[in-house]
Amino acid sequence: MDTSGSTTDFGDHVVLRYGGTKEMVPLIRHEQMLDMLMERARQIVQGFGSLDTRNMYLFRHEYNSPTLLFPITSPSQIASFSKNPGCILEIILVDRTETAVIPHVVEPESYMLPTFCDFCGELLTGLLRQGVKCKNCNRNFHKRVRMQQGIIVEHLDPLPQDRGLLDRPCYPHCHQRLLEFRCPRCQRLLVSLPHTLIEHSYRQFTVCKVCDHLLVGLMKQGLKCRDCGVNVHRKCAMELPSNCILSENAISRVNFADSEAEQASSSDNIPLFRLPDDIKIKKKFKKKFLHREKRIEKYVFSRPPGQVGVRATEKKNLEGWMIHFILSDPERRLKHYWMMQNNAIHLYNEYSEGIGVNPNRVYRIIPLAEITSVVQNNGKSVLAKHPPHCFEIRTTTNTVFCVGEDYHAFSGGPPKKIPRSMSVRPTSNTTMWFQFIKESLQPPSRNNEENAEQALEFANLYQVLSDKTLGSGQFGTVYSAIQRHSGKEVAVKVISKERFSKKGSGAESMRAEVAILQQTCHPGIVCLEFMCETKDKIFVVMEKMNGDMLEMILSQELGRLNSRATKFLLVQILCALKYLHDQGIAHCDLKPENVLLSDMGSNFPQTKICDFGYARFIPESQFRKTVVGTPAYLPPEVLQRKGYNKSLDMWSVGVIIYVTLSGTFPFNEGEEVSISEQIQNASFMFPTEPWSEVEPLAVDLIQKLLKVEIEARMSIEKCLEHGWLKGEQLYRDLRDLEVRLNTPRYLTSPQDDVLYGPLR
């Protein structure tokens, strides 16, 4: 290893690691230290195989970094290793997926015979020096093409032997050496970019780019690409590879002051039901909850597995360059990079290989909810000089997007015998986009003819956002959806009939839930809007809220709510529950996850009870024994398979109050003592932390609700009259909500106005 020059030995070292191989390398200060480390790493790797098709990188283990591995890219980073002797440098290999791209080396040339440009196919005209010729590949080009930097680039394999010529710079921006050459705009050569072909009349001899035969005729002899100038026969258009090269500003120019563009750019709103970044319990509080003394150990209040309220993803489904135009303006042919993501089609102006799209250059966003239909075009071209488009996207705004170009029409239809060059090509972008958009507009269901009519009826009314999962229940999954005619966001519960048992208990529960929702009408209960049934699925459409009570609890710094917010939410729950009980309905699965909130950004939102999958019609003085609900919120009589009535909901209310004020569950199921014994042990049920900060009246209400004896359990009427749920501040909070909602009073009464004074 060459260490000539001024060096200073630190007496330290680093460890190069490649797989299971480790080697200690002395750390010295030298201008070429990074190159020396890379060379030694290359020698280690070459002992296991060749590096011809792979790139090598060094990463330092940085445990304080979120990524754990920190790339080593500059010599200045080497000096910091002296502060951390013995650090490990990981050798990472990455396969090369790119072809070596090098520029032509051209010089002016005089031709004695007719010669055509190898780029555009037109005849090189003139007496002397008609064009330029590459010394390496002997290809000929127009002089004007030479000035288009990044276009005259070839993929040469194998590489020429005369590297001296290749090392000479051809253009100002392409001066890198052979394998390091990568002009930014030449990256587009590696992207499948379609040509924008239009009929053209040629005044000079021109050959076809595909077959090298002359374009014959007096007028409109062939097709010319609007962007790169390539010329082809009509019959050869289908065989032209999608390798168009765009010059500067070749993609449609966009005026971002246009209201249409502003609307598209401003639609990147945060989707509903997305968890905020701070919905986590801080580590110090979580640690305090988990490390309590064993005698008062509680379960930390968190969402059970499989009950996450929001599963919003930003999954990219399909992308690629597409040619399109609006039916009302067929002359304006546009070329954009289409990407399906977030339940919308994004049309980007810029795309670079390895970098991706430029998010600041969005031409338009087409939400799936605005698409009414996707229709294949089998007719003639809108304009005779352009090929027919492949399919149409029709929207609720009466805008029709014509997508793709059908080159088969120029040759009189698809060829009977597919050329060998075409047989290995994948399905065209237009075909994939047509099928994908058509499938995306359908609700999640089986693809069979029996379901087609019912699924089409539902798809015409609602667009299900299948990548925005709101939650899951015992029989189905809840998705976000858009009502097409109004744009209103709703929640759709997709129920799979396959989950129903053969005995029919599942179907009975589902029908009971729908029947209950159809009979209820209360501001505190989620509203049923629509129901549709296919052979294997049932779609239940309900109004959508912006979160649930559990999310609100977990979003707090201490993982619990204060008394004022708890009382505000509790009165709304009790009023809705009283309405259900008056209708003879027991919810049977009351818990924070099933209490939806109108606004996660407010401390005093409206609440609505949802998920009536376990709800039962229980008349007065009758009991049931069927299994219902979530065990953590159920009273002993249900867990012990004894008879229960509507008072089981009051037990659930007591558990909700407990977990809301403390952040933990009231009972430890792992203890050998029974629930009744745990209730009698006040020090176990209400430890000093955090119950010393809670009013004694709240503890009194919880104790009266968590009674093992059904008869001793507080009724809903007495609960609403309890002293903890009275007070001027609570009255004003509830009355303010009623005024904001502009609904008839359902939380307060005129007697409260007399007692506390009217709201000012």
UniProtKB/Swiss-Prot annotation:
Cofactor or coenzyme needed: Mg(2+)
Regulation: Activated by DAG and phorbol esters. Phorbol-ester/DAG-type domain 1 binds phorbol ester with high affinity and mediates accumulation at the cell periphery. Phorbol-ester/DAG-type domain 2 binds phorbol ester with low affinity but may mediate initial contact, resulting in a conformational change allowing previously occluded domain 1 to anchor the kinase. Phosphorylation on Thr-626 is then also required for activation and may also result in a further conformational change.
Binding-site residues, ATP: 470-478, 493
UniProt-annotated catalytic positions: 589
Key word Oxidoreductase present: no
GO biological process annotation, one example: intracellular signal transduction
Free-text domain note: The PH domain inhibits PKD catalytic activity in the absence of DAG, either by direct steric occlusion or distortion of the PKD catalytic cleft.
Protein name: Serine/threonine-protein kinase dkf-1
Native source species: Caenorhabditis briggsae
